[in-house]
Amino acid sequence: FEFILSNGDEFSFELSKADMVKTASFKGSEENLHFYEYQKYLTTIGDKYQAINNELAAAKTKADTAAVNKKSKDLSNEMKEYRNNFVKKYPSSFTAVVFNALSEPEVPEKDPMLPDGKTKDSTYRYRTFKGEYWNRFNFTDDRIIYTPLYEKKLEDYFKLLVPVPDSINKEADFILGKTKNSPDLFKYSLWWITRFAETSKVMGMDESFVYLVENYYQKGLATWLADSSLEKYIDRAKKIAPNMVGQPAIDVRLPDIDGNMHTLSSTYPTADYTLLVFWSPTCGHCQKEIPRVDSMQRIISKKVNFKIFAVETDQEDEKWVKLIKDNDLNKNWIHVHDPQHTSNFRATYDVYSTPVMYLIDKNGKIVGKKLDHSNIEGLIDFLEKKKKQDAEKKTK
């Protein structure tokens, strides 16, 4: 049994357990009277949908199915019309706020034609949907965060966006700007978008996390956080910032097992791409992943000049050498370790578990991270294709 409760409300209600929705009555709460007007309507709609589902199950021909689907679409439109009329009738009610939050832009089923009359405007529906997505959402009513609606609205919207930092940062600024005068909505929005950026599996999205920390947390806008919690965000951003995609790779200078020194900065200019790998021979996942990386590099090396700069992280020299020998990890590999703990690679490259991999181009720029054997070849193919396209544009 659900009802709407705001601070300071005093009201009473009566109902029968036999049918709580149909028998619910309220005294002293116009809000809930309106809400249960809708709940009772939903009961009748539910009965109609059940009848439609039964008809669909019994449909024998395409014509039967099409007729039932039309009934379902008509009923959906009836619900939209009911909600729109409800909003007009009770515009100040919280239920109206909810209905507005639930609404989605209406876009044509097919893409319209461009002015030339020959080409479809293939992004029109996307642009329209995205551009009108928040039109009816009330960014000034903090109560909405106590429903599941706002989180779902954010999830759907950020899934809709192109997952690149510039796009995410722009939309984060838009939403946080809209909620800046609504403390609870702002707090929830900043928390949600920060978590989205920090936990994203999409390569490069950590740039958005750093952006949020630098532009909101460090500027004192997360006023609800204790100093210790705020410092954790700032510290995490500082560790990520130097190794984001697009940043120059910080040099690593370490010896191999024979004491010969090798530097990352002298390696990447000699290859089209260099894979910087941090791994441990005692790590179970590394024991499986590193041989797979070698298989992958043998394929990639037929396409481009490819090298691997592999840093052993745990000073397990005997196991390290054995794993290299057993898996023939020699061609295109440079193996180094840090027996004197002089390189500070864990902080520089955010290495707190293994394996960790970065892809570095010929100019020393980080072009990939959060990698494994399954996606490195695809990333290089993409980068090579982009280089070719950019070169063709320059010649035109």
Where are the language model's segments positioned?
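Structural microenvironment flanking redox-active thiols in thiol-disulfide oxidoreductases
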Residues: Q287-N327, H341-F345
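Short active-site neighborhood of thiol/selenol oxidoreductases, capturing the structured segment around
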Residues: T263-V293, K307-F309
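Start-of-domain marker
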Residues: F1-D9, K159-V162, L176-K180, L185, ...
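N-proximal helix/coil linker or "cap" segments that precede and/or mark the start of modular domains
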Residues: T199-P255, T267-A271, E318, K322-K325, ...
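A non-transmembrane, solvent-exposed segment enriched in polar/low-complexity residues
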Residues: F1-P91, A101-L102, E106-Y133, T140
